[in-house]
Amino acid sequence: MAASARGLRTLQSAHSSTTVPRLQLAVSRCYATTTSPDPPITNSSNSSNSSNSTPTPKQRITAFKDKLNAGPSFSDFVSGGGGGGASNDRVPLDPAEAYALKTALVGPPGRKKQIIRLPSWLKTPIPDTPNYRRIKSDLRGLNLHTVCEEARCPNISDCWGGSSKSAATATIMLMGDTCTRGCRFCSVKTSRTPPPLDPHEPENTAEALSRWGLGYVVMTSVDRDDLADGGARHVVETVRKVKQKAPGILLECLTGDYAGDLEMVALVATSGLDVFAHNVETVEALTPFVRDRRATFQQSLRVLKAAKEARPELITKTSIMLGLGETETQLWETLRALRAVDVDVVTFGQYMRPTKRHMAVHEYVRPEVFDLWKERALEMGFLYCASGPLVRSSYKAGEAFIENVLKKRRGEGADGGDGGNSTRREDVERLVAGGVVR
C-alpha cells in the first residue's frame, strides 16, 4: 500500500515538471461594414505574420469611407440620380412620361394604402449655398422669423440661395411665428394666446433688410386676433423703419384681414409700402373647408377693395392655390370678382400638403394648365400674373416685373416715358416689348 502511494507521487512530480506550450489566440472583432472569416488559431511563432495580413479596425473604417466618397452624393440620391457612369447616360423622358403621376404603397403590413408620389416638376434642390447660410445667420442673430421656414416653402433654396447678394432674398414674417388662426393648408404654428409682440422687431427687420442691400423685399405676418388692432400698427411701424433705413427700397406687405376692420387696412395701405398683398387662397365655394372660419372670401375682397380705395396708385396683389378641388367655372368667377375690386396682380401655385395633419392634395395640376390660366388672367386685364406649380404669393417670380412697373411710375429709368403717368395696360405693353417678361 505504501509502495503504491510512493509510485503515484512520483508520477505526479514527473508530470508537473513537463512544460505544456501555451496557445496564442488572435482576437477578431466584427464590424457591420465588413465581413471576414475568423482567423485560425496560431502559436506565437507565426502570430506576427498573421497580424500583418488582417486589416485593422481603423483600416476597415477608412476603406468604408472611401467607398462612400466614391459613390453618389446625397443630392443625387434625393433627386433620383446616381453617381455612376451608367446613370448619367439615361435617355431623357418625353413630356407624356415625365408628367405621368406615379403611385406608391405606404404604411405597415396589412394596412398599406396607395398614395400619389410627388411629381418630378415639384422637386427642388436642397439649400446649401453661402447666401443661404448668410441669410439664415442674419435672421437668427436678429431673432427674426420667415414664412419661408414656417410655411415650409419649396422655393427656399432658390430665394435664399440666389447666385448673388442682390438675387438672394427672404420673406420676413412679422409679429412672431405663432398665428391665432388654423387654416387647413398652412403649417405655421397656431395658438389662441401667442407670445406678446417683440418691440424690437421693427428695428431688427429694418436692420436685416438694409444689410442685404435688396431692391425689392416682401414682408408678411401672422394673424393676431388677440390684439385690438390685429397688429396693424406694428406693421406700419415696421414699414416706416425700413423706409427710413433704406429709402429706395420697394416694399411689398402680405397682410391678414385684420378681422375685417377696414380702418386698419387703410392704415397699412397708406404706411408707405409699394405693394399691398392679401390672399384669397382659393375659390369661394372651398373657402370654408380650406381657411379658418374667421376668414371668408367676401371679407378678403373687401380688404383688397379698401386698400385700393385708400391709395388708388397702390398695386394690390392676391394669390390662389390650385389642386384643392376647384372647378374651371369657379376659377373664372374668382378672377372676375378680383377684377371687380381692381386687383392688379394675381398668382397661381400648386397646393402642397405640409404634413399628414393638413388637408390632402386633390390634384397635382400640370404645368401647361398653369400657363393657360396665366394667359386668361392677362387677357382679363391683370397687370401681371405669375403662374406655375412652385409659384407662391411671396415668391420672387413676379418681383422683377413689378419692380420695373414701380420704377417707371416713379419716372426712374423710363425710356421715352411720360413721367409715370401711363395706364397700367401701357406699362404692361412697354415692359413686354422691352423683354422684361419672357
Swiss-Prot record:
PROSITE patterns the record matches: RADICAL_SAM
Cofactor(s) this protein cannot do without: [4Fe-4S] cluster
Catalytic activity: [[Fe-S] cluster scaffold protein carrying a second [4Fe-4S](2+) cluster] + N(6)-octanoyl-L-lysyl-[protein] + 2 oxidized [2Fe-2S]-[ferredoxin] + 2 S-adenosyl-L-methionine + 4 H(+) = [[Fe-S] cluster scaffold protein] + N(6)-[(R)-dihydrolipoyl]-L-lysyl-[protein] + 4 Fe(3+) + 2 hydrogen sulfide + 2 5'-deoxyadenosine + 2 L-methionine + 2 reduced [2Fe-2S]-[ferredoxin]
Pfam family of the protein (one): Radical_SAM
Domain Radical SAM core: 162-383
Composition skew (Low complexity), residue ranges: 34-57
Residues of the transit peptide: 1-31
InterPro entries: Aldolase_TIM, Elp3/MiaA/NifB-like_rSAM, LIAS_N, Lipoyl_synth, rSAM
Binding, [4Fe-4S] cluster 1: C148, C153, C159, S394
Keyword 4Fe-4S: yes
The record's free-text note on cofactor binding: Binds 2 [4Fe-4S] clusters per subunit. One cluster is coordinated with 3 cysteines and an exchangeable S-adenosyl-L-methionine.
EC code(s) of this entry: 2.8.1.8
NCBIfam families registered for this protein in UniProt: lipA, PRK05481.1, PRK12928.1
Name used for this protein in its record: Lipoyl synthase, mitochondrial
Provenance organism: Paracoccidioides brasiliensis (strain Pb18)
